[in-house]
A protein has these predicted regions:
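Short catalytic/metal-binding and nucleic-acid-binding patches
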Residues: 1-183
Length: 183
């Protein structure tokens, strides 16, 4: 299957999705959700891109981002994955006696023949990236993200899931991760 063509440039909104290796439910943990969001916020400040929407699901995250002159998705997503992949295995190893941490370590362990950069892989290698060219598509992607926790049966309504931009847009709650507005 051929790779999808990516169009990077200023004034292009991107819908991105990255998944945890083997679809492990790493983000069932508030600790890792919080660390991920803090890392994303720090990277946004460093690279000056905008976050228009997101939802953090147990095994993946989709987001709408507006790249900056300093960084497009081909730099943003790998940087985010690299930074989180450093602290997550260390944190799991420090708490490996806890059953959940032990299961996560097992799920993220690579076979011995592929230990190129360490014994664990946190993220699947690639990420999905779609240019969002219209307001209709932007709203479609926001609605998809905000509805995802409800569709998966994790909550009964989007406002009950704190790890989403829904609360920012509809409740004025920016306590988890403030969103950037498009001008």
């Amino acid at each position: 299957m051929p790779r999808q063509r990516h169009y990077y440039g200023l004034n292009h909104l991107h819908f991105i999705t990255a998944s945890i290796y083997r679809r492990a439910r790493l983000f069932d943990s508030d600790r890792f959700r919080g660390q991920f969001v803090a890392t994303l916020a720090g990277l946004r400040a460093e690279l000056s891109f905008k976050i228009i929407g997101y939802v953090l699901m147990p095994e993946h995250f989709p987001a709408l981002i507006w790249p900056s002159e300093r960084a497009d998705p081909s730099r943003i997503v790998p940087s985010l994955k690299e930074r989180t992949a450093k602290f997550i295995p260390k944190n799991l190893q420090a708490h490996r006696e806890l059953p959940w941490c032990g299961r996560m370590l097992a799920a993220l362990t690579l076979p011995p023949t592929v230990h190129l950069h360490g014994p664990y892989r946190v993220w699947q290698r690639r990420f999905y990236d779609l240019n969002v060219w219209s307001e209709k598509k932007r709203l479609e992607k926001l609605n998809y993200m905000h509805g995802n926790p409800v569709q998966r049966g994790m909550v009964t309504s989007p406002d009950k899931w704190p790890w989403s931009s829904f609360r920012f847009y509809f409740l004025g709650d920016d306590s988890v991760l403030p969103m950037d507005r498009l001008l």
